């Protein structure tokens, strides 16, 4: 009998939609209070997930959704880096 592997699902903090964990980008507030983009998904700290969509990133920055989810001010450089990552995956 074959076992069906469970796919871990996570919710985008901006849209509220659920996606498989590997399809989302994780942004982490480290224990030191820094904000980093966790490409591997193993970084230590409080994480929030975003869908890989430029509109989602723009909305997160405009509404400060990541700031609220991570309980810290997210620098503009993080949003720029997120856009760059998404742009590389598209093109």
PLM features: what roles do these ranges have?
Residues 20-37:
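Short recognition patches in nucleic-acid-associated and regulatory proteins
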Residues 2-9, 34-48:
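Immediate flanking context of iron-sulfur cluster ligation sites
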Residues 18-21, 54:
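Cys/His-rich metal-chelating microdomains
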Residues 15:
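Metallo-beta-lactamase
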Residues 1-5, 88-91:
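Short, Lys/Arg-enriched, disordered terminal segments
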Residues 12, 51:
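Short cysteine-rich clusters marking metal-coordination/redox-active sites
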Residues 58, 63-91:
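C-terminal structural segments of small proteins and small subunits
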Residues 49-50, 58:
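Short hydrophobic-aromatic micro-motifs
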